[in-house]
């Protein structure tokens, strides 16, 4: 059953990521990997909320964990795309954008997880 839940969550997470990437490219352009940045930061925030809620309710080994954490958020966020897009920025000579993507993703991602945990503990 857990594989089905992970697969279903992954299907939904991958489609949500595709929608975010498409939306970001349409609204913000493609000179910076905005979509991946937004997906990774919002995914970090959602992960923080989910971990706090699941931990506080002793549900870390529950079916919801497989669906949400391994499935949905595992497919929604994407480290491999982040690293590839960062490499492309550096190769294109956009060093400032490359550094902004790497440092911003890590720093803001950590902040997003922290804020998500704080918010999740309110529930």
Feature locations, PLM:
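Membrane-interface helix-loop junctions in multi-pass transporters/channels
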Residues: 1-123
């Amino acid at each position: 059953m857990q594989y089905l839940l992970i697969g279903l969550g992954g299907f939904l997470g991958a489609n949500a990521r595709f929608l975010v990437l498409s939306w970001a490219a349409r609204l913000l352009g493609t000179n910076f990997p905005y979509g991946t940045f937004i997906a990774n930061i919002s995914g970090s925030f959602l992960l923080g909320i989910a971990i706090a809620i699941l931990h506080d309710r002793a549900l870390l080994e529950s079916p919801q964990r497989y669906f949400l954490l391994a499935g949905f958020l595992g497919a929604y966020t994407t480290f491999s795309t982040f690293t590839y897009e960062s490499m492309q920025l550096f190769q294109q000579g956009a060093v400032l954008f490359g550094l902004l993507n790497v440092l911003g993703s890590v720093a803001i991602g950590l902040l997003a997880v922290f804020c998500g945990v704080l918010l999740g503990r309110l529930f």
